[in-house]
Amino acid sequence: MQSSSKTGASRRSWSACRIHATLGLLTLICAWSGLTAVSAAAASAPSHVKATQPLVALLYEHSAYSSPRTSAPLVASMWPKTPITGEQTTLPVIGKDNGRGGTRWLKVMLPGRPNGLTGWIEQGGTYSLVTGWHIVVNTSLRRVWIYFHGRLQRTFEAVVGKPSTPTPSGNFFVQETIIMPASEPGGPFALATSARSDVLQDFDGGPGQIGIHGRDGLGGTLGAAQSHGCVRLATADIDWLAARSRVSSSGADPLSTTTRCCT
């Protein structure tokens, strides 16, 4: 289990990773600074995807517990800024509890290991958001579907993880969207997700973090299972996707380099 999100990987350490996938679907929730992902078996584009997903943005560091009380075991410590770009940390909300003594709690999805990690955080020091964007990745068909408010917007062909390093299945979210330097593989953009490789505990100095990114400097045949677990898209497709997610260039003022999704 990854107990803290304080230590972030460099852009290269996760973006160069590749995921090998077994049969399944990866579904991503698209938050202001990320998307949500889910993996599961399917023969075609899902006919129904949830229209919206509630989110919460952190204003300061929060402790996530296994149940809605501070005496419960600590699951993770979440910083208010993402590790690579310094964007606002935004987490999908999957439950609520009014608690005792007036303390309100939120059950949220968390990044890191094990995949599917969740925890309870206090609602204080947060603000609410909502997203209508979802990404669904079918690793068997090697296809990516993009939904907005439950309606299919785009279908992309992808490179997914090879059998020895499969793309993990499950529900995840995009933590941050990164402009990749020309000298780094995986450009021109990379979406860092909350998922981690089930095979690689680390990769190129990073935590085996799964990304959705381009093929610059990497190649790979679209529609093939050839990566170490990450999902690679054609340049035009990752450009389109990145334009609908918050984007920040590492080392720059995130406010001056940020774009928000178009509706």
Locations of regions flagged by a protein language model:
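Boundary regions of SH3-family modules and the immediately adjacent low-complexity/disordered segments
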Residues: A43-K50, M109-V137
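SH3/SH3-like beta-barrel superfamily modules
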Residues: P83-G125
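Beta-loop motif signature
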Residues: A43-N98
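Bacterial N-terminal signal peptides
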Residues: T22-T36
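Signal peptide processing junction and immediate N-terminal pro/mature segment
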Residues: L35-A43
